Regions:
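Positively charged n-region of N-terminal signal peptides that target proteins for export
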Residues: 1-5
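Exoplasmic/lumenal beta-rich domain surfaces
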Residues: 98-133, 212, 217-226, 255-317
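Short acidic/polar inter-strand loop motif in beta-rich domains
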Residues: 248, 328-336
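Short beta-strand elements
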Residues: 333-351, 356
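Compositionally biased low-complexity segments at domain edges in trafficked proteins
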Residues: 189-210, 350-377
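Hydrophobic h-region of N-terminal signal peptides that target proteins for export
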Residues: 11-21
Length: 377
């Protein structure tokens, strides 16, 4: 048995690596429980300072549901913490993936005896244990634990992950488990945000949209219809949206897996939450409108990348610009939302678009990003 201080996190500074294309390898994964699978949270949901890294399976409101290994493999790690994942079990599989089971109440007798021996040896409830390939083998369908509510859990459930064993990136378990879960519901958009950037914001660094002189308009959406009037636009603009996904036979709300934005039928932005590294999960404050979250606890996902200008549109003609959002979940349910922005050159004044001189979003977000980059560099 090997004792290690913690997991080694990948250092991926390149922004494009935040949402890499997930190489899909077919695997014979079974469900971790033998009760009807219902989710309370899905992969990639927006959380405070991070993306949700797995699926939260409901356990019918109680602790003590049997948990089974989803495939053959070996226990590679047992972790016990007062917070976070609580009591968690990690199983490496020959197919190159690791399954993770968190917030457990207790382990099977065979695994629990190993855990207790280590806790007595270290004289500590909190332990982080690592094992070699031949120490604790398990078979697919073998009972390994009981569900619980340990650690930072807000109620009884099983937090379940699939990781790339080599890189430790987390991957959306619904890539394998979507056929097991009923979902006939489309994502829904609740609001559309339009950002208009002052011309000087791009003179020195095109794509740098964190200017303090940015005008933002937010229009609510209900039943896929705008509930207000969109602004006239000119110059460099970008968009954002507030949206959630839904599933059949449950009242929970979930994160949207795939967001695509089109201008005149040409895709100008794509966000696919299929896989990410734990280092890059902190970029959530970079792709969301932090002002809306800090002041109103509202998640607006920005449909542009400030570092390279992807998703930014230059409005330079007085005409209609036709946009289309396509939001999809892992089951293929797709919501299409079409809207038009009118390009209209403003009257020449000192502050023609009414850009605010101070933007809370810029101040908060700029400081947040600077702190993040200082940690990474």
């Amino acid at each position: 048995m090997k004792h290690k201080a913690g997991l080694t996190l990948l250092f991926l500074l390149c922004w494009l690596s935040l949402f890499p294309k997930a190489p899909f390898v077919d695997a014979d994964f079974r469900l971790p429980m033998r009760i009807p699978p219902v989710l309370s949270a899905n992969f990639g949901e927006l959380r405070s300072d991070h993306f949700h890294s797995g699926l939260d399976f409901k356990t019918q409101g109680v602790i003590g549901k049997s948990i089974y290994s989803v495939a053959d493999g070996h226990v590679s790690r047992i972790s016990v913490r007062k917070y976070g994942y609580g009591k968690a079990l990690y199983i490496d599989h020959p197919n190159g993936y690791t399954s993770v089971y968190a917030h457990l109440e207790y382990l099977s007798p065979r695994l629990d005896s190993v855990l207790r021996a280590a806790q007595y040896e270290e004289k500590s409830y909190e332990v982080n244990l690592f094992f070699d390939t031949d120490e604790l083998p398990v078979k697919q369908g073998e009972w390994i634990a009981m569900s619980g509510n340990t650690g930072g859990s807000g109620g009884p459930h099983l937090h379940f992950e699939i990781r790339d064993t080599q890189s430790e990136d987390v991957m959306d378990p619904l890539l394998w488990y979507a056929p097991y879960i009923k979902d006939l519901a489309k994502p829904r958009i609740q609001a559309l945000a339009v950002y208009q950037f002052a011309p000087e914001a791009h003179q020195s660094a095109p794509g740098d949209c964190l200017s303090p002189r940015t005008k933002k308009s937010i229009v609510n959406i209900a039943d896929n219809q705008l509930q207000g009037t969109l602004p006239k636009v000119w110059g460099n603009i970008a968009l954002g949206l507030k949206a959630y996904d839904y599933m059949s036979d449950t009242h929970n709300i979930y994160g949207v897996q795939l967001i695509r934005l089109f201008l005149d039928d040409k895709e100008i932005f794509r966000q696919d939450l299929s896989r990410f590294s734990f280092d890059n999960t902190r970029y959530i404050n970079y792709i969301t409108d932090y002002e809306e979250w800090a002041l109103h606890r509202s998640w607006i996902m920005r449909s542009y990348f400030p570092h390279n200008g992807q998703g930014i549109v230059n409005i330079s003609e007085e005409k209609d610009y036709h946009f289309r959002y396509e939001l999809s979940d892992r089951h293929g349910n797709t919501q299409v939302f079409r809207f038009t922005l009118r390009g209209e050159k403003p009257m020449p004044t000192d502050n023609s678009l009414g850009y605010p001189q101070v933007d809370v979003s810029h101040d908060i977000q700029q400081k947040s990003i600077k702190r993040l980059l200082q940690k990474l560099l």
